[in-house]
Regions:
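Alpha-helical substrate-recognition element adjacent to the catalytic core
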Residues: 2-152, 157, 230, 234
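C-terminal cap/substrate-recognition subdomain and adjoining C-terminal extension
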Residues: 97-296
Length: 296
């Protein structure tokens, strides 16, 4: 699994050349609570001096009105809510990105998928409904900026948000996935998508229908039944497990050996199947019926 390249060839060119010789896949991942521990909307609200409770009230209210696609609530608030719109500037979005708490080993995940899996190459992209400035700032030096898709704004001369150019929420994620497939000339069965919440439902259904592979990193009651695999971990590298098992076809022993060769130990690996049940009393109790014996 060791990489070899000529000294006179730039690393990026070597990676591209090798990618053409391997089975090429796209790994597309959500950002908030998929590659991070917290929601960037809360981080931005705190930076702007807006309380967590107030932000939650506004975002929840937007979601209930169904005016925007799920996941697009923050973009709508930044443009239309007076409190957000009057305060936020591009520099605030970039600073919020620096304050987002990332899951560990994202850089190792990117490197593994690009270089370490023999006969396979995964192009790693991030597709999020969050502002693209936040995500690119958070992942600076880890994932190339042109591999990150998020909600884009147009600003006026004062740095105020004037309009939304693109919202990558709901069906917006579907559009980005299809653009990537067309751009990279990859079949729809060679895409892996990773997400955590309701805003990922449309894109997961779209990918499943076309024989792609989907992974949930939460126990969201709407998403978990849709995803082909679920994995819960504090490490971004956990995403590798279902990919290596289901896509590459490795056995657990080989996966453990790969991790150990990189100085990592899979300390706990519990395979569970979760049944989600709600059990309540029946609305109308069944009346007991007496049995009468009739003698002739």
């Amino acid at each position: 699994m060791q990489m070899h390249q000529h000294n006179d060839q730039p690393e990026t060119e070597s990676m591209i050349e090798k990618a053409h010789l391997k089975k090429r896949y796209i790994l597309a991942s959500d950002f908030d609570q998929t590659l991070s521990f917290n929601d960037s909307g809360y981080v931005l609200a705190d930076l702007l001096g807006i309380s967590e409770a107030e932000f939650e009230r506004k975002a929840t209210g937007m979601a209930k009105l169904n005016l925007v696609q799920q996941g697009g609530e923050l973009a709508y608030l930044l443009l239309h809510d007076p409190e957000f719109h009057s305060k936020v500037r591009p520099e605030h979005l970039r600073e919020a990105g620096k304050r987002v708490r990332l899951k560990p080993n994202i850089d190792a995940l990117y490197r593994f998928l690009s270089e370490e899996v023999e006969d396979y190459h995964f192009d790693f992209y991030v597709i999020s409904a969050g502002p693209v400035e936040v995500i690119r700032s958070a992942l600076e030096g880890i994932i190339p900026a042109d591999h990150i898709y998020g909600t884009e704004f147009e600003y006026n001369s004062r740095g105020e948000i004037e309009r939304i150019l693109q919202v990558t929420a709901g069906y917006g994620k579907v559009a980005v996935v299809d653009q990537l497939l067309e751009k990279l000339k990859i079949g729809p069965d060679r895409i892996v998508y990773v997400g955590d919440g309701s805003s990922d439902i449309h894109v997961m259904l779209h990918i499943n229908r076309r024989d792609g592979f989907t992974i949930a990193v939460s126990e969201n009651k709407y998403l978990a039944p849709i995803a082909k695999r679920s994995v819960i971990s504090d490490s971004a590298l956990a995403i590798l497990i279902p990919i290596l098992e289901e896509v590459v076809g490795w056995e657990p022993r080989l996966i453990r050996e790969l991790f150990e060769s990189k100085g990592l130990l899979i300390q706990q690996w519990d395979k569970v199947q979760t049944d989600m049940l709600t059990i309540v009393p029946v609305s109308t109790p069944v009346e007991e019926r007496s049995v009468v014996a009739v003698e002739e």
